[in-house]
Amino acid sequence: MNGFQKTIAAVLLAAVLLFMIYLPKCAGKMLERDQYREWLEPEEEEFSGVINVWHVVGFKPYMGSVGAWLKKIADRAERRHFGVYFEVESISEAEAEAKLQNGEFPDVISFPAGFLNGRELRIMNGTEIFGIDGTVVDFGDGYGAGELPAGFDCGMDGRTLRALPFAAGCKLALFYPERVTAAEMTEILKHITENGESKADADSCSNDGFGTEAGKFERSSVDEFKKGKGDFCIGDARAAGDMERLAAANKAKYFEVLPFCNETDEVQFVGISAKTEREKMGCISEFIADMLSAARQSELCTLGLMPMNPAAEKKFEQSFLTEAYGLLSESILNLPNAFTGAAARRAAF
């Protein structure tokens, strides 16, 4: 055996000895591991605890509840994050205002246009529209990564983005066809809009009536219209839904519906408190991204609300909602600003 062969033999012998010495230790560690338990145990989260979500109800959908819709999205987020809990609370504007005056503020807030002034909310930088897998929300063809659709600038406070619109309602004309025809109703609506009546006070009306070539017609409030009084009223999708349910139970007269105009003051926004802790932001961003996803946005149609994601499938069971939201989509740039909208303006709390 020459020198080279002796060297190789020595190296191999050393390797065999090391293997024999350390194999039992390595095998012992592997035998001590419970790999099944490791597989079941969730990954450690950056944050564990409660994320508070308020849904401030400024208007109601045709049917169902936006609060319940948000709760389902929260449940999905909880399943993805062990130890993270979303508490979703639906409250009125008056209840929310009382809480704000008392110094309370949630981590995430869903609010109607004009309820907040913007300074209470965190400045958004686009990371809020990225989902769990790090991909951006799909807003459809024509929108690049992180690019917001037309109309989303209504969440701007000056030059900063502080809220994102996620749903919109509409104004409708409800009328009794035995008292006023659809053609006459169309003429009345034209008269109302041409005389500068704002969309905000369209349902706070007088009973002075409106004249047309065919005669004079009495306009009532939604509540009076439900009792069969007046010839027509201006209401929202919930008013139409309530009337349909009453009519189905033979508790209201047959009525018909036409879109009131191509504008609305019923827009719901989502924002993040300026005081929300940084470690919560990952879960919150995923929650908001899910709200804006095409799949979740399409679900709003079953509530009778218009989704704000252009990629969402817009299918409404009621033809008058299809027509009303079709008109609204054409004037999407006219949505009210989140902080200076038609609803009551409020100072900072």
Q: Which sequence ranges carry the predicted segments?
A:
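C-terminal capping/gating helix-and-loop segments adjacent to ligand/active sites or protein-protein/ligand interfaces
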Residues: 66, 301-349
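Extracytoplasmic/periplasmic substrate-recognition and gating elements
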Residues: 246-308
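Non-transmembrane alpha-helical segments in soluble domains
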Residues: 177, 186-193, 222, 226, ...
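Structural recognition of the beta-strand scaffold that forms the well-ordered cores
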Residues: 88, 107-111, 163-165, 172-175, ...
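Conserved N-terminal structural module of periplasmic/extracytoplasmic solute-binding proteins
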Residues: 1-115
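Loop/turn elements at helix/coil->beta-strand transitions in domains of secreted/extracellular proteins
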Residues: 48, 82-85, 104-107, 160, ...
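Extracytoplasmic ligand-binding clamshell segments of periplasmic binding protein
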Residues: 93-96, 192-254
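Hinge/lid segment of periplasmic solute-binding proteins
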Residues: 111-173, 254-257
